[in-house]
Amino acid sequence: MGNGFSDVNALSNVSSDGYLVAKLDDLINWARSGSLWPMTFGLACCAVEMMHFTASRYDMDRFGMIFRPSPRQSDVMIVAGTLTNKMAPALRRVYDQMAEPKYVISMGSCANGGGYYHYSYSVVRGCDRIVPVDVYVPGCPPTAEALLYGVLCLQKKINRQRNFIRR
């Protein structure tokens, strides 16, 4: 169930008969959810917790996540911190350069809705006004466990997607 395959009986066929029967959608979603390559967009103190997520205690590599330096190589953007009006066009430009399918994780109160600086004239009140957000991770700053839970929620969301139109 956690790997994206919904039929437990199909997994028993692998051990007894040596083959697996699955839908192509399930296989594609399983591969996509197991190889997320995030692009960091660390803007403030939430980026420190994002660094904790990469360290040995949480080890994001075991979930197939490897930070990529270029938006053209990544399919997940983690927006962490206060997004200002001046930085918003850069965020949109980086998002537009990402490969399809692309996902966005909004990390922290500032990225989710402006946070502590919500009433400031120069702060965007949520990065979802600039880019579509798939997962919101609450907290100020959110812990590495919260980001891990957000990544697991994104993997579940990817596993529920339909890639092909059935007629």
UniProtKB/Swiss-Prot annotation:
Family matches, as SUPFAM superfamilies: HydA/Nqo6-like
**A Pfam cross-reference name:** Oxidored_q6
Q: Which GO terms describe its cellular component?
A: plasma membrane; respiratory chain complex I
Q: Using the UniProt record, give the first listed, main subcellular location.
A: membrane
- Cofactors demanded by this protein: [4Fe-4S] cluster
Please state the Enzyme Commission number of this protein. 7.1.1.-
Q: Which GO terms describe its biological process?
A: aerobic respiration; electron transport coupled proton transport
- Cofactor stoichiometry and binding? Binds 1 [4Fe-4S] cluster.
On assembly, the entry states: NDH-1 is composed of 14 different subunits. Subunits NuoB, C, D, E, F, and G constitute the peripheral sector of the complex.
The name this protein carries in UniProt is NADH-quinone oxidoreductase subunit B
**Organism listed in the record:** Neorickettsia sennetsu (strain ATCC VR-367 / Miyayama) (Ehrlichia sennetsu)
Lineage of this protein's species?
A: Bacteria, Pseudomonadati, Pseudomonadota, Alphaproteobacteria, Rickettsiales
Q: Which gene encodes it?
A: nuoB
